[in-house]
C-alpha cells in the first residue's frame, strides 16, 4: 500500500508545482492565455489539426489579443510592429523543429535554425533568385506554366467542347498544381515532365510531395507515430518520402554526369545550386546539399504557388465583378496572340492588387517558423519575454486586424490601389532579410499564369457549383469553399469544388 500512496503523493506534488510555477512563478505568468496552454502543449496540437487552424487562430486572437501564451514557454504574437521587430532581429533564430528527422536532405535554407548556416546558404544561392537571373529562366517557366495550361485547355475545347461557345469543364486545382510542380521539377531537378500532356511520372511526384508534407508533419508533431507498431500507420508516407529522396539523388547525379561529359550548362536552379559559392568563404555546396536545396525548392515552391493560384481562381468565381475588371485590364493591354511576360505584368495594376488581397484574405499558411533567442530577452506589449521563450506568429489574426484592414472580413482588392503602403502589411513571404528567398519566382509564376489564362479563356462556374456569388453568409459575403491545412491551406474537396467552365473569348 505504501508504494501507491507515494506515487499518488508524487503526482499531486508534481501537479501542484506545475500549477504554482505556471500561474504565479513563471516569467510569463502575466501574459494572457488559457490555463491549459500553461500546462501542456496538447491544446496547441489540437489547434493545429487541419480543420481547426483558422477558427482556433481567430478565437485566440479575439479572446487574448496581440500576445498570448499558446503552450508552455511559447507565446504567440500578431501585432505587425512586434512581428517586424522579431523577424528583423538577428538575435532571434528559427526553432529547430526538424532536429528529430536526422536527415541531411531536410537541411536546407527553409529549415536551417542556425543563423550562420542560413546566412551562408543565402549568400550562396540568393543571387540566383534575383529578378535579373530569374529572367534568364523565364522562357522555361512560361513553357511549363501558363503555356502548358493554356495548351491543355485548348486541346480539351477542340476535342470535347460543346454548345455555341465550345465550352468544356476543367479542374483548375488539378491543372494548376501540375503546372507549378512541373515548373519546380524543371528548375530544381532539370526534368520537365510535361504533366499536363502526359501525367505519368508527374502523378508520382505530386504524390511524393504531398506524402512528404504529411510525413514531416507527423515527425514533428506526432513522433509516437514513428515508433513501432504505430509506425505502420504512416508507412506509405515514409516509403513515398524515400522514393522522393532517391529521385532527387538521381537528378543531381545525372546533371553532374552530363557536366563531366562537357555538355553546356543549362540555366536552371539545379545548375545554380551546383555552381553556387559563398563570396565570403568561397565554400561551394556538397552534392547532398545541392540535393537538399532541390528537394526544399520542390516542397516549398510548388504546392504554395499552386495553392495561391487555386485561391485566386476561386475568388474570381466568387466575385464576378472583379473577374470582369481583371479580364478587361488584361485584354485591353494585350492582344490575343501576345504571350504575357513578367515584365508585361507591371502594367496589370488591378491584377496585382487582386493577388495581394488574395494573399491576405486566403493566406497560404497560418504562420511562419517560430523564433527563439537563447541569449537575449525582449519586451512585447509590455510583457518581458525571457531568453529561451519560443515566439510564434498568428498570421490569420494579422490578416484580420481591424486597426490595419478596413472591413477585413470582406474581399476588397481596391484597398491596395487606394493605399499601396498596405502591401507592407501582407506577410505572405515573411519579412525583411529573412523573407522567402523564392518570392520573386512565386510572383513570376502567379502573375504570368493568371494573366495569360484571363486573356485566353472565358471562365464561368458550372450550374451545379456549391460555391459562388449566390452562396453567401448572413452579411451577404460569398462563402469560400472549405479548406484544410497540413502545411498550406488547400481545398478539402478539390474534385467537387474546383470545377470551372472555360471557352474561347468571343471575337
From Swiss-Prot:
Known pathway: Mycotoxin biosynthesis
Classification via SUPFAM superfamilies: Cytochrome P450 (SSF48264)
Family to which this protein belongs: Belongs to the cytochrome P450 family.
Keyword hit for Heme: yes
PROSITE patterns: CYTOCHROME_P450 (PS00086)
Residues the record lists as binding heme: 436
Induction, as annotated: Expression is under the control of the secondary metabolism regulator laeA. Expression is completely abrogated when gliT is deleted in cells exposed to exogenous gliotoxin.
Taxonomy, superkingdom: Eukaryota
Keyword Signal: yes
Known cofactor(s): heme
Organism of provenance: Aspergillus fumigatus (strain ATCC MYA-4609 / CBS 101355 / FGSC A1100 / Af293)
A GO MF label: monooxygenase activity
Annotated EC: 1.-.-.-
GO-annotated biological processes: helvolic acid biosynthetic process; secondary metabolic process
Residues in the signal sequence: 1-22
Function: Cytochrome P450 monooxygenase; part of the gene cluster that mediates the biosynthesis of helvolic acid, an antibacterial nortriterpenoid. Protostadienol synthase helA cyclizes (3S)-oxidosqualene to (17Z)-protosta-17(20),24-dien-3-beta-ol (protostadienol). The synthesis of protostadienol is followed by several steps of monooxygenation, dehydrogenation, and acyl transfer to yield the final helvolic acid.
Protein name: Cytochrome P450 monooxygenase helB2
Pfam families per the UniProt record, alphabetical: p450
Matches recorded under InterPro entries: Cyt_P450, Cyt_P450_CS, Cyt_P450_E_grp-I, Cyt_P450_sf, Cytochrome_P450_monoxygenase
Keywords assigned: Heme, Iron, Metal-binding, Monooxygenase, Oxidoreductase, Signal
Amino acid at each position: 500500500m505504501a508504494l501507491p500512496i507515494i506515487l499518488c503523493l508524487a503526482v499531486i506534488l508534481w501537479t501542484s508545482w506545475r500549477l504554482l510555477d505556471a500561474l504565479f512563478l513563471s516569467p510569463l505568468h502575466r501574459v494572457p492565455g488559457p490555463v491549459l496552454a500553461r500546462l501542456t502543449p496538447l491544446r496547441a496540437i489540437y489547434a493545429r489539426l487541419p480543420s481547426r487552424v483558422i477558427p482556433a487562430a481567430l478565437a485566440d486572437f479575439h479572446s487574448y489579443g496581440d500576445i498570448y501564451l499558446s503552450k508552455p514557454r511559447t507565446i504567440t504574437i500578431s501585432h505587425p510592429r512586434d512581428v517586424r521587430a522579431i523577424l528583423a532581429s538577428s538575435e532571434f533564430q528559427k526553432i529547430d523543429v526538424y532536429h528529430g528527422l536526422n536527415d541531411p536532405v531536410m537541411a536546407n535554407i527553409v529549415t536551417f535554425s542556425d543563423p550562420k548556416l542560413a546566412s551562408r546558404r543565402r549568400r550562396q544561392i540568393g543571387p540566383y533568385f534575383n529578378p535579373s537571373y530569374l529572367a534568364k529562366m523565364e522562357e522555361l517557366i512560361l513553357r511549363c506554366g501558363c503555356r502548358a495550361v493554356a495548351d491543355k485547355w485548348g486541346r480539351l475545347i477542340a476535342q470535347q467542347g460543346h454548345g455555341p461557345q465550345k465550352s468544356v469543364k476543367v479542374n483548375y486545382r488539378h491543372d494548376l498544381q501540375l503546372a507549378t510542380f512541373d515548373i519546380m521539377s524543371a528548375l530544381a531537378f532539370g526534368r520537365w515532365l510535361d504533366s499536363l500532356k502526359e501525367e505519368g511520372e508527374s502523378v508520382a511526384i505530386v504524390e511524393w510531395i504531398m506524402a512528404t508534407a504529411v510525413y514531416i508533419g507527423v515527425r514533428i508533431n506526432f513522433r509516437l507515430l514513428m515508433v513501432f507498431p504505430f509506425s505502420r500507420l504512416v508507412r506509405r508516407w515514409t516509403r513515398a518520402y524515400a522514393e522522393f529522396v532517391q529521385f532527387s539523388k538521381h537528378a543531381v547525379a545525372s546533371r553532374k554526369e552530363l557536366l563531366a561529359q562537357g555538355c553546356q550548362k543549362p540555366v536552371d536552379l539545379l545548375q545554380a545550386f551546383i555552381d553556387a559559392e559563398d563570396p565570403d568563404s568561397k565554400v561551394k555546396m556538397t552534392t547532398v546539399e545541392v540535393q537538399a536545396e532541390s528537394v526544399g525548392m520542390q516542397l516549398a515552391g510548388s504546392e504554395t504557388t499552386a495553392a495561391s493560384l487555386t485561391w485566386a481562381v476561386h475568388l474570381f468565381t466568387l466575385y464576378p465583378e472583379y473577374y470582369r475588371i481583371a479580364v478587361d485590364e488584361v485584354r485591353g493591354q494585350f492582344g490575343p496572340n501576345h504571350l504575357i511576360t513578367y515584365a508585361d505584368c507591371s502594367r496589370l495594376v488591378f491584377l496585382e492588387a487582386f493577388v495581394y488581397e488574395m494573399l491576405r484574405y486566403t493566406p497560404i499558411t497560418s504562420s511562419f517558423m517560430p523564433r527563439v533567442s537563447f541569449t537575449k530577452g525582449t519586451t512585447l506589449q509590455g510583457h518581458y519575454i525571457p531568453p529561451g521563450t519560443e515566439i510564434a506568429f498568428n498570421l490569420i489574426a494579422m490578416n484580420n486586424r481591424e486597426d490595419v484592414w478596413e472591413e477585413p472580413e470582406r474581399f476588397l482588392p481596391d484597398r491596395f490601389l487606394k493605399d499601396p503602403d498596405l502591401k507592407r502589411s501582407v506577410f505572405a513571404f515573411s519579412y525583411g532579410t529573412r523573407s522567402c528567398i523564392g518570392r520573386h519566382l512565386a510572383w513570376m509564376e502567379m502573375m504570368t499564369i493568371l494573366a495569360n489564362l484571363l486573356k485566353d479563356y472565358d471562365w464561368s462556374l458550372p450550374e451545379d457549383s456549391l460555391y459562388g456569388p449566390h452562396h453567401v453568409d448572413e452579411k451577404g459575403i460569398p462563402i469560400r469553399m472549405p479548406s484544410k491545412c497540413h502545411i498550406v491551406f488547400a481545398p478539402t474537396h478539390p474534385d467537387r469544388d474546383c470545377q470551372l467552365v472555360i471557352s474561347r473569348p468571343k471575337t
